[in-house]
Every structure is written in C-alpha cells, then in structure tokens.
C-alpha cells in the first residue's frame, strides 16, 4: 500500500514538473490591423467596430482645428477598465469608477490620472488606414504632436 501511495505521489510530481516545461499560450488580437478607407470616416464620429481589438478610430478636430483621424486605446488610464462611448453625451465614460474622457481622449472627470493613449496610425498609398497598437503616444509627454499619432484628412 505504501508503494502505491509513493508511486502515485511521484507520478503526480513528475506530471506537474513536465507541465512547467510548456508555456501558457495567450491568444491576443493582432498588434496592427486595417481600419478601412480613410474617406468612410465621418467628422466627429467614434467608430467602435474595432473595440474588440482594443481601439476606437475617430475623426474629429484637434486643438489646432485640424480635421484629423486618430486611434485611441480602449483602456482607461485609471485601472484598465474599458470605457463606453456615449453618443448622446459625446464622451467616453468608464463604468468602473466614473472617469470621463472627451472625444479627443482627454480626461475631464473622475479619477483617471491622464488622457487615453493614442496608437500609431498611417495611410497606405491606396488610402487604407493601418493602426499599429504596438506604438503608443501619451498626450502628457507631448507625443500627440508626433505625426505618426494622427492622419490629416
């Protein structure tokens, strides 16, 4: 009986040891994606069809009144929840702790310490928008002025 218990324990330990040799595979959305034709985006509209891959694509006027297209991260800068776009109020509202963000991504209410991050965005020769989520831009560091963080329309 003792041998059965000993062999069972050693077999279990061997299985757990072998299990650690194989890493956990994490399925994540692609770091870059095609966001369609530039001309399909309407002014002052948030396109949430890419929310599942972690981005909103937006066409709006910036602080210098330029018509631009940019991609915002769907991650709240407070605790990482996903804000919702409230079309009637023209703002992003985080359901976790009430942070509010303007269409530009700038925080104006709640505990979020900084604006939403922008992703790198570019246009192909055919006018197709490519969003690259591996490159992020933060407003508080002055990175929103980088020409890779927006497209002029």
Whereabouts are the PLM-identified features?
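N-terminal pre-ligand scaffold of iron-sulfur
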Residues: 2-86, 119-153
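Proline-rich low-complexity regions
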Residues: 23, 95, 111-113
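Exported/periplasmic cell-wall-interacting domains
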Residues: 107-115, 124-125
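A sequence-level detector of short linear motifs
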Residues: 102, 109, 130-131
